[in-house]
Amino acid sequence: MSSDTEEASEEIEGNQNQHVNKQPENDDKMDIVEDEETPEEPIENDPNYMSKHHSVFQKFKSSVHDVKGEEVDEETPEEKEDIEMQDLVPLPQPELPRDKRLVSTAAHLNNLDWLTTPIYTAPEETKPFAEFQNPPLSSLMIKNLRNMGFESAFSVQISVLNLMLKDIERNRLQPDMRGDLLVNASTGSGKTLAYSIPIIESLQTVKVPRVRAIILVPTKPLINQVKTTLNQLSKGTNLSIVSLKNDLSIKEEGIKLQTNEPDIIVSTPGRLVDHLTNGYISLKNLQYLVIDEADRLLNQSFQNWCQILISKIDEFTNIKERNISNSWKLNVQKMIFSATLTTDAGKLSLLKFHKPRLIIVNNKEQLVNEMFSLPATLNEFKLQFGSAKSSLKPLILSKFLLSKNKLANVLIFTKSNDASLRLSRLLSLIMNKLGSETINIAYINSTNNTTSVRSKILKDFSKQTINILVATDLIARGIDILSITDVINYDLPNSSREYVHRVGRTARANQEGFAYNFCFGKGEAKWFKKLMAQVGRSEKNIEELELDTKQLIEDNDESMYKESLDELQQQVFNRA
């Protein structure tokens, strides 16, 4: 460092010492405290010293500046890196955050995820009834099931029983735990047994007859079918089961109900509402309400049956004053079953669900955003023909049945009463001319739907006395004939819902079945594609079945077909 700098430093230090010595002795303690609390201010910031020793400070600062400059100069300058030139391109941007799946409001409302979390179960699952545990089925129930020919439960029955048997056990001490049940399962999956078994299990020990369960179905044949099942399951118990029909007047039937009050009622909604409004049925002790084929019942008003029924139930469940006698009253447990369960929030809200649980008999990965499901054992086929061949439609059907050996256990659906009557007669004439005189073909529609005639036709069909049955959508629901192997949609249905119920007449109880769909022209092909877009399938898809009409129809077939048409016309004129 230079001599000028050393001089300036010595002079500053001397002045500092003189300044310290001039402090009065009385202020020593105060100065010590201040020094501890406040750091000493640098001398160069004191204006008094700066004015007295301005020149010395200037020399000191310039010397320090020179020394710093020399140190910097001694350092080796860093080499600049070569900058690689790039073309003008957009700057990279981070990925925009997106939902994993964006679903429209309409698609969201086409399922029931908004109501509750679905419980999925595989359609092919089975389990012996004797293996149900915690709690098990009663020995009497297992005995009755075996007498009916049932050893194992199907998928829908397993799912429902697993929940309902636990509810029955739990509700003996916790009556507030009951939750409603919605079940979407294909036709022929065993829904009737699924709700009948837990109801009988729960009520089999009751001593005093009271209306404790009501089962609603859309048609009279279903009433008979459900009542028969309940009677078989309740053998060995004292349960009273009745069905409400139009055989008696409301008054006569009402008097019988009051004289001998039943435990379980099977009815259509309209008939039940008539008895409720006339005061013949009390819902005070009601525990179970089952709505089978719920989509059809909710789509039809039946004198506002839903609002009336739920309001009558609420009269006894919405108790304003709790006391010892009603504190353990069970809520009415609702069970909703359908192969095409509606997703309409407006319709479902009328039922006022409590803690709902949803069971879907289908594979979760394969489920589409619709509540229409088909049996896993069903094989579907589409037969496409040109519109020019539509005039030969009955002949093509006849030749198809013969070529594929579909001559028994065949159910054919048409669009109207006239179409079913005409096709059944024409098929009989064509089959006779083709050498198949032994094939018995019958029809069933609203013109011959009396109880006796209908029962005889279905009985003969199940025994194969009738080989081919031509029908309308009247029997698309409610007939349970396990022997049906083939369903043919001669005329396409009006909706996906009707399609599901039509083809559900086969492939029942995990048996294999076949469905054939006849499409003539581009219009029918387009309509069929639209119908199928809303139907859920587990694994299989619809197969295109190619049929060469040139090979199928021989040279003399068209002339024979014309003769058959003439004979049919003559029969109609003779009947007229």
Curated annotation (Swiss-Prot):
Gene Ontology BP annotations: maturation of 5.8S rRNA from tricistronic rRNA transcript (SSU-rRNA, 5.8S rRNA, LSU-rRNA); maturation of LSU-rRNA from tricistronic rRNA transcript (SSU-rRNA, 5.8S rRNA, LSU-rRNA)
Comp. bias regions, Acidic residues: 1-13, 33-44, 71-85
Main localization (coarse): nucleus
InterPro entries, per database record: DEAD/DEAH_box_helicase_dom, Helicase_ATP-bd, Helicase_C-like, P-loop_NTPase, RNA-helicase_DEAD-box_CS
Residues where ATP binds: A185, S186, T187, G188, S189, G190, K191, T192
Span of domain Helicase C-terminal: 396-553
Keyword presence, Ligase: no
One MF annotation (Gene Ontology) recorded for this entry: ATP hydrolysis activity
Domain Helicase ATP-binding positions: 172-359
Keywords: ATP-binding, Helicase, Hydrolase, Nucleotide-binding, Nucleus, Ribosome biogenesis, RNA-binding, rRNA processing
EC id: 3.6.4.13
Disordered: annotated span: 1-86
Motif Q motif mapped to chain: 130-158
Subcellular location(s) of the protein: Nucleus, Nucleolus
Family to which the UniProt record says this protein belongs: Belongs to the DEAD box helicase family. DDX51/DBP6 subfamily.
PANTHER family attached to this UniProt entry: RNA HELICASE
Purpose: ATP-binding RNA helicase involved in the biogenesis of 60S ribosomal subunits and is required for the normal formation of 25S and 5.8S rRNAs.
Domain notes: The Q motif is unique to and characteristic of the DEAD box family of RNA helicases and controls ATP binding and hydrolysis.
Protein name: ATP-dependent RNA helicase DBP6
Organism: Debaryomyces hansenii (strain ATCC 36239 / CBS 767 / BCRC 21394 / JCM 1990 / NBRC 0083 / IGC 2968)
